[in-house]
């Protein structure tokens, strides 16, 4: 299979997001040792190659998935590959369940997360406080925290059509988070959350002053490079973990909170988390409840 054929498949798959296309390209490159022959090779050979070169079950699934999609596009058989995909998916789920069991005893409580958050405020670690506070109260992903801090002036908060930025808007008595760029945006659209927290407002003002910047005049990013520029996703994830309790990931934070609320059987709170995060209640419980 040529790169040109793969490009043909991508062009025909207009529903794919930029992120997904990038991931597909990365998986396709892994078939280089077999000349990327996803169309001409037999299913058995492709399965064998993936099993021997894929590494983790999750990576094998990703490789097999792109191979299946490409072969379907060119009307080639995929029955054996689909069977292998089901087997790998089952193995991967068992691995995830085992990890959940380990995390049940290792992860801290929500009270500990809040105590850490409060300590950041006391110690005037404004950037850290804002990050962990937003992540906890709104169940945010890393990407959601890639945002600009702006004032509540109409001209700045209106935004342009197709705006792909996230904003933390500082208002007189509260603040508002506006998300135009997050994982499930195409499904749930723009999200707006008002945050009634005087501590958060103070932390935002102090962070701006600490950086010697002017709100509304300078570009102010919550997470940025030393020079104040936009960070890539990997750097954002590392930066966030430098602020969190015990270096936990945003996924760990969500697992702690979801699991505790699920144990209390508080459906309304779970629905709020589901809405804030931009995911279904079913996925929320399956992926983040440690007892499921």
Each predicted region: which residue ranges?
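Short, polar N-cap/turn motifs at the start of nucleic acid-interacting alpha helices
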Residues: 246-247, 265-289
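Alpha-helix N-cap/helix-start motif at helix boundaries, enriched for small hydrophobics
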Residues: 21, 131, 144-148, 273
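Basic, Lys/Arg- and aromatic-enriched nucleic-acid-binding interface segment
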Residues: 108-143
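Active-site/catalytic core of tyrosine-dependent DNA strand-transfer enzymes
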Residues: 186-253, 257, 262
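Flexible interdomain linker/hinge and immediately adjacent N-terminus
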Residues: 79-118
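Non-catalytic DNA-binding core/recognition domains of DNA-processing enzymes
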Residues: 3-86, 251-255, 278
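Amphipathic alpha-helical scaffolding segments
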Residues: 146-155, 260-261, 276-278
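Conserved tyrosine-mediated DNA breakage-rejoining catalytic core shared by Y-recombinases
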Residues: 147-193
């Amino acid at each position: 299979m040529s790169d040109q054929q793969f490009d043909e498949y991508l062009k025909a798959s207009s529903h794919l997001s930029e992120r997904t296309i990038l991931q597909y390209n990365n998986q396709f490159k892994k078939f280089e040792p077999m000349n990327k022959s996803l169309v001409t090779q037999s299913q058995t050979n492709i399965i064998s190659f993936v099993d021997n070169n894929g590494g983790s079950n999750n990576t094998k699934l990703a490789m097999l998935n792109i191979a299946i999609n490409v072969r379907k596009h060119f009307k080639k058989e995929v029955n054996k590959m689909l069977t292998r995909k089901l087997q790998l998916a089952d193995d991967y789920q068992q691995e995830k369940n085992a990890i959940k069991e380990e995390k049940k005893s290792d992860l801290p409580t929500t009270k500990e997360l809040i105590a850490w958050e409060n300590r950041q405020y006391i110690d005037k670690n404004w950037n850290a406080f804002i990050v962990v506070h937003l992540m906890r109260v709104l169940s945010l992903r890393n990407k959601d925290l890639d945002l600009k801090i702006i004032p509540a002036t109409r001209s700045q908060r209106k935004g342009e059509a197709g705006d792909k930025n996230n904003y933390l808007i500082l208002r007189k008595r509260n603040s508002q988070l506006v998300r135009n760029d997050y994982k499930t945006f195409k499904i749930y659209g723009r999200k707006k959350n008002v945050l009634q927290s005087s501590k958060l407002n103070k932390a935002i003002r102090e962070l701006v002053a600490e950086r010697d910047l002017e709100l509304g005049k300078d570009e102010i990013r919550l997470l940025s490079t030393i020079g104040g520029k936009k960070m890539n996703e990997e750097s954002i994830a590392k930066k966030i973990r430098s602020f969190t309790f015990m270096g936990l990931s945003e996924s760990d934070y969500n697992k702690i909170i979801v699991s505790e609320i699920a144990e209390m059987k508080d459906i309304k709170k779970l629905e709020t988390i589901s809405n804030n995060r931009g995911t279904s209640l079913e996925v929320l419980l399956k992926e983040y409840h440690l007892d499921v």
